[in-house]
Amino acid sequence: NKVIRFGFRQSIAAMNLKQEETWRVKFSEIPSPLQKTGMSIALNFSVPVFVGNGFQPDMSFHFVKDEKNNTVLMAKNNGKAHFQITKFSIQDASGKVLKDIDTMKYILPDRHVSIPMDGFNTTSTKGLKFVMASNASKTSVVYDITEN
């Protein structure tokens, strides 16, 4: 067993952050050169670290067409904290699911991501909603999909 601890030289409050700050901590296991027989597995993974108190994301969603005329959902974060997208659906005004997407993305402050909507086409975004189950509560996170 290995325990790894890390921290900051000053408190988060002393950093005077204007928005949430983000780091990616990478862990790479180096295989032992002494073990020459059999198979060895070296782990290599990274973990996002988000630092800041009281900051909130401010999300907007709209559809665009890519160079092959496929529908793409643009998710933009105008807020001061990251937003995590997981499994979500596109629903109409009555709550009917039009498309389910299973993905995992982080959208950092002042950034956007493009999410391909394979097989989904629409001529109007009127009444369409981005609906995602919230990990923090039993309610869903719901956003209107706006015209571009």
Locate each region found by the language model.
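Short acidic/proline- and small/hydrophobic-mixed sequence motifs that coincide with surface turns
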Residues: K80-I85
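Asparagine-centered strand-capping/turn motif at beta-strand->loop junctions
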Residues: L73-G79
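A generic structural signal for beta-strand entry/edge sites
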Residues: K68-V72, H112, G127
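Envelope-exposed proteins and targeting segments
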Residues: K2-I4, E21-W23, F45, N69-T71, ...
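Intrinsically disordered, low-complexity Pro/Gly/Ser/Thr-rich segments with frequent PxxP/GP/PP motifs
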Residues: N1-A14, K96-S124
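Surface beta-strand/loop "capping" patches
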Residues: F55-L73
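Terminal connector regions
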Residues: S11-G52, Q56, T122-N148
